[in-house]
Amino acid sequence: MHRPENRADLTPDLTLVRLSHGEGLDLPAYETAGAAGMDLRAAVPADEPMTIRPGARTLVPTGFVFEIPAGHEGQIRPRSGLAFKHGITCLNTPGTVDSDYRGEVKVLLVNLGSDDFVVERGMRIAQMVIAPVTQMAIREADGASTTARGGGGFGSTGLS
């Protein structure tokens, strides 16, 4: 696990509240120096692993409340290895954790593979990227401005 030495690079701080079923789990962590996302672990009971059948989806607890700083969001994203090797991904990706949310962060996993997948306690199930958020002033107009692209939608710019 990567632990940055320069604390100035970590500002602002991210405060976590550990829930009782998260006791004993490692804190979410950046696994390498260049990692954009911190890995989230499954807070399922050790004696009750969770099985996700092919085509099924389930919410997996992380055991933590995240106090995301104002002006930021937490983006829940799949782990590439789980997706490639097992067909396990996050159903709503990226899932947004708002800065004013104070409940437990849970991960919505879906099994797109052909075999049952067992989620065990402490398994790294997803990653969270903390990203800045811009809230826009919203105004209504009578028409859209003109651009070279215009209203061309899906596939309108071609492949090459």
Curated annotation (Swiss-Prot):
GO terms for molecular function: dUTP diphosphatase activity; magnesium ion binding. It is an enzyme of class 3 (hydrolase). Pfam families: dUTPase. Substrate binds at residues 79-81, 92, 96-98, 106. Its EC number is 3.6.1.23. InterPro entries: dUTPase, dUTPase-like, dUTPase-like_sf, dUTPase_trimeric. Pathway: Pyrimidine metabolism; dUMP biosynthesis; dUMP from dCTP (dUTP route): step 2/2. Its cofactor is Mg(2+). Keywords: Hydrolase, Magnesium, Metal-binding, Nucleotide metabolism. It comes from the Bacteria. It catalyses: dUTP + H2O = dUMP + diphosphate + H(+). GO terms for biological process: dUMP biosynthetic process; dUTP catabolic process. Belongs to the dUTPase family. PANTHER family: DEOXYURIDINE 5'-TRIPHOSPHATE NUCLEOTIDOHYDROLASE. This enzyme is involved in nucleotide metabolism: it produces dUMP, the immediate precursor of thymidine nucleotides and it decreases the intracellular concentration of dUTP so that uracil cannot be incorporated into DNA. NCBIfam families: dut (TIGR00576), PRK00601.1 (NF001862). This is Deoxyuridine 5'-triphosphate nucleotidohydrolase. It comes from Sinorhizobium medicae (strain WSM419) (Ensifer medicae). The gene is dut.
